[in-house]
């Protein structure tokens, strides 16, 4: 045991963190072990994280668990305690969820968030330059794979439905929004938004010209990836994040130029522009409509028997894809699916064939219908179901796993699953991060102000995405978010960046 504990001298946490920053986004979501009653699976990345936590635990044991001295640790523990209370209540009092499934999702929440502390301790020896270059290297590989996916039929491993989540290799046609190494285009969009929101601070901290060029290329790559995903929510979240970053960094002259270029490129993308234009009216009318809120109330009253006995996940919008024949078992009664032989069907923001020649964008009526469908799924099904779960037990909610895999609003999901108690403690974590950042930003330490700008911009853009996307449950982006927060929080607590004076 003494030999194992002596690993402190080797400082394995730094290399492990860099490995996680690179491996988690890049390794496709192949399932290692399926879990009964859900298509969330145990994957290779879970073993990598488990090994990382084991090494981190040895360091903590050797030093008397210094992590417990951090104020934010107590808030994390409060949230996990609230989640456990919610799960126990749903299992033993309400008896409305599968115990194994609920505990599985509870442990996964802890797994995602635990990397905050691993990243915090790993930065005691790492330089911010090394983190920035790891993110840049990862972005480049994700971009290259995305190009291969779009132009050379590189496969994607999707988790958009139960069949795809079994690890099938799928081929996207050239009109489908790309996913690269992620499980869906929304995940890729959220990840790119997070990276774009924090990378401006690297331009300020790093002083070598070649490093700044690398960071600028990283931003360009991730912006292009964001445009290719055609995610309206993430595009708006990016505009919020980059605006905050530039304002807090006092780059006032850069802000109008960056916003003009971003919006111009956003609307120059036919797919994204159609989705942006057609989203405004349906969403605003849904929000303003009394009928929509009456539907939520009616749904709440009528959903007890339908939703509280055996909850099932609500399917999210699926990409239009072709399955590689070798990956699919077929029989005489099922026609084989050949790549490139599929007949495209009109989908949300999708190009369709006309007369077999060229391609054309959907008509305004088709695009409007697609946008209305997307908002209706949230307003008429997923969100009312979350409200119903919350009303059943407002204090502690209905337990993890109760709402299935899709709510498309992490705040309503939190209220439905862990109630007021869990939601308040969860938001308290983010409030602590924001207040700590604000306090450091207002200090006279220029380094702390720069780091604070990145943390605030990254956090706010991520929280903006959470309004319409379940970002805290998507493993790749959740892992990355908590690692980034841990990295930046370390610098705010210690004032060390291991870089030259800013």
What are these regions (language model features)?
Residues 40-44, 105-109, 179-195, 415-419, ...:
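Membrane-interface micro-motifs in multi-pass membrane enzymes
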């Amino acid at each position: 045991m003494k030999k194992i504990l002596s690993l402190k001298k080797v400082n394995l946490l730094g290399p492990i963190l860099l490995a996680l920053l690179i491996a988690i986004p890049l390794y496709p979501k192949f399932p290692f072990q399926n879990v009964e009653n859900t298509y969330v699976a145990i994957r290779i990345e879970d073993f990598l994280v488990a090994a990382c936590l084991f090494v981190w635990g040895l360091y903590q044991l050797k030093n008397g668990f210094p992590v417990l001295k951090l104020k934010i640790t107590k808030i994390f523990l409060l949230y996990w305690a609230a989640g456990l209370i919610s799960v126990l209540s749903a299992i033993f009092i309400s008896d409305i969820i599968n115990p194994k499934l609920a505990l599985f999702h509870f442990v996964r929440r802890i797994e995602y968030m635990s990397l905050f502390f691993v990243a915090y301790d790993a930065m005691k020896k790492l330089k911010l330059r090394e983190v920035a270059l790891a993110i840049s290297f990862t972005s480049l590989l994700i971009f290259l794979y995305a190009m291969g996916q779009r132009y050379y039929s590189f496969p994607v491993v999707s988790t958009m439905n139960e069949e795809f989540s079994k690890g099938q290799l799928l081929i996207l046609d050239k009109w489908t929004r790309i996913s690269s190494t992620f499980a869906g285009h929304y995940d890729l969009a959220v990840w790119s938004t997070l990276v774009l929101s924090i990378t401006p601070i690297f331009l300020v901290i790093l002083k070598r010209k070649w490093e700044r060029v690398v960071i600028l290329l990283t931003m360009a790559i991730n912006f292009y990836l964001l445009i290719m995903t055609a995610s309206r929510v993430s595009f708006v979240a990016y505009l919020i994040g980059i605006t905050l970053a530039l304002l807090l960094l006092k780059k006032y002259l850069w802000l109008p130029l960056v916003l003009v270029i971003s919006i111009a490129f956003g609307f120059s993308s036919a797919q994204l522009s159609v989705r942006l234009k057609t989203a405004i009216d349906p969403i605003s009318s849904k929000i303003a409509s009394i009928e929509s809120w009456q539907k939520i109330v009616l749904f709440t009253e009528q959903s007890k028997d339908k939703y509280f006995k055996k909850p099932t996940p609500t399917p999210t919008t699926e990409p239009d894809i072709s399955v590689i024949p070798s990956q699919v078992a077929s029989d005489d009664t099922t026609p084989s699916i050949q790549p490139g032989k599929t007949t495209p069907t009109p989908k949300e923001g999708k190009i369709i064939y006309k007369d077999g020649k060229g391609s054309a964008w959907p008509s305004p009526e088709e695009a409007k219908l697609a946008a209305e469908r997307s908002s209706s799924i949230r307003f008429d099904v997923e969100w009312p179901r979350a409200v119903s779960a919350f009303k059943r037990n407002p204090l502690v909610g209905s337990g993890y796993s109760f709402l299935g895999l899709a709510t498309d609003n992490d705040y309503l999901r939190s209220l439905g699953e862990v109630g007021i108690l869990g939601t308040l403690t969860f938001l308290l974590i983010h409030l602590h991060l924001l207040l700590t950042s604000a306090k450091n930003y207002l200090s006279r330490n220029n380094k702390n102000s720069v780091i604070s700008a990145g943390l605030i911009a990254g956090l706010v853009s991520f929280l903006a995405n959470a309004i319409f996307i379940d970002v805290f449950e998507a493993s790749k982006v959740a892992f990355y978010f908590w690692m980034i927060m841990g990295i930046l929080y370390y610098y705010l607590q210690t004032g060390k960046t291991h870089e030259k004076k800013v």
